[in-house]
Amino acid sequence: MGIEELYKELHNVNASRESRLKHSEIILNDLTLLPLLIDIMFRVDDKISCRAAWVFEFVCIKYIYAIIPCLEKFTQNLHKVHYDSAMRSISKICALIARAHNSNDPNPLKKALLPRYKEYIIESCFDWLINEQKVATKVHAMETLFLLGKDSNWIHKELVNILERDYQTQSAGFQARAKRILRKIKSTL
């Protein structure tokens, strides 16, 4: 399957869990399609990019290590995504990367996530937190920053400042996650 066939197939994806799961299995069964999926996902002015992001999220949920050969392209292009539904999936993938990187178990992502890739993720997550984004994107961003911040004190300091500043004006979902993250950060100080 080439990029045009994959693009056509993505027209069949809908927001249902079954649809996203079914299409993620197509990618997982042929990982040579993953770079093509990512190319489509970063056609950020095309609504089909959202469907590609949904599928990619499910690929990463099932097998996060599939992202390793594509980390550079993924991290360098994060900041370009602007559709809300794609941003939610992209921010969730960042959280999955951070969880794998922060895991106590040895895994290939720990070595593959180079400092510059972390910087791209951190920068995008801070942008999502301070700009007008949906709560799901912000929640995944704060989790990612908390996990990646374990390696750098400045990240936690900045995260605490933002969460405390924005706490009163944000939604209940934001507040619940912010309270949990703040508690975790303060317990490590």
Located regions from the model:
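Alpha-helical scaffold domains
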Residues: 1-189
